[in-house]
């Protein structure tokens, strides 16, 4: 069974269709009667004055109302005017945009001819100023990067130089220590061969510990005595005189002892400080005689001790 709602919808559609057809017929009848009425008015007016002929463009078409023709003409004119205005506006915008793009590349001086306004000129100047500022900042950043790279390269170069100097210094110190150890070992071998204790006509070679101890006592005895007779020193330490002289010369060459051996067979021990004082005296006086040097040495060099040290046994 069909729902009542369907019947209601169909009835509403039929009523709407009837109203639409009725209204359409009324409009058609009114449009047909209007030309007849317009023709009667000029005929009656022709008895008084002859009507002027109409222009071709003002003649209306058959069956077309004047009002509708005028409305269409106005709409067409408005559309044409609107299209022209839109075309002009788009053309003006394109020209302005192209001119702005061209003005960005041109210097500001080219716009001083008065063809553009002050406001636009100010905007262009601001754009140019911002562009110049960006370029200056970019150049400053590049220069800063270049300087930082240069400083970093210099730092690395300086670090490398210091590292090489440190390595060279360590190598020199290592070689000096090795050479010192080698000299000490050679000196020990010489002392071991030379120092002989003569006891009851039988010579015995000293041990390593005895040799070091004997050498220390030998040097200490000379330093405390200041002036020693080489023959007496040789007899006291149990060495031959020539061996004693050779040992003292070796110690002088090594820098262990400082002093002089005179022509009377004596060794005079002089400390490095006393040697510096004598050298300073000679340098200050210029030319010095032996007598003056001997007199000055009495005050510059401490001769002997109140209690001389005992010679090594």
UniProtKB/Swiss-Prot annotation:
One of its GO terms (molecular function) is ubiquitin-like protein ligase binding. The keyword Repressor does not apply. Residues 215-313 are annotated as: Mediates interaction with UFL1. A motif (UFM1-interacting motif (UFIM)) lies at residues 194-208. Pfam families: DDRGK (PF09756). There is a cross-link at residue 266 (Glycyl lysine isopeptide (Lys-Gly) (interchain with G-Cter in UFM1)). SMART domains: DDRGK. Ubiquitinated. Ubiquitination probably triggers proteasomal degradation and is negatively regulated by UFL1, the enzyme involved in the ufmylation of DDRGK1. Ufmylated; conjugated to ubiquitin-like protein UFM1, probably at Lys-266 by UFL1. The relevance of ufmylation is however unclear: as DDRGK1 acts as a substrate adapter for ufmylation, it is uncertain whether ufmylation is a collateral effect of the ufmylation process or whether it is required to regulate its activity. One of its GO terms (cellular component) is endoplasmic reticulum. The chain crosses the membrane at residues 1-28. Residues 117-215 are annotated as: Mediates interaction with TRIP4. It is found in: Endoplasmic reticulum membrane. Residues 1-113 are annotated as: Mediates interaction with CDK5RAP3. The modification Phosphoserine is found at residues 73, 113. It is a single-pass membrane protein. Residues 40-88, 130-185 are annotated as: Disordered. Keywords: Endoplasmic reticulum, Isopeptide bond, Membrane, Phosphoprotein, Transmembrane, Transmembrane helix, Ubl conjugation, Ubl conjugation pathway. Belongs to the DDRGK1 family. Component of the UFM1 ribosome E3 ligase (UREL) complex, a multiprotein complex that catalyzes ufmylation of endoplasmic reticulum-docked proteins. The UREL complex plays a key role in ribosome recycling by mediating mono-ufmylation of the RPL26/uL24 subunit of the 60S ribosome following ribosome dissociation: ufmylation weakens the junction between post-termination 60S subunits and SEC61 translocons, promoting release and recycling of the large ribosomal subunit from the endoplasmic reticulum membrane. The UFM1-interacting motif (UFIM) specifically recognizes and binds ufmylated RPL26/uL24, resulting in stable association between the 60S ribosome and the UREL complex. This is DDRGK domain-containing protein 1. It comes from Bos taurus. The lineage of its organism: Eukaryota, Metazoa, Chordata, Craniata, Vertebrata.
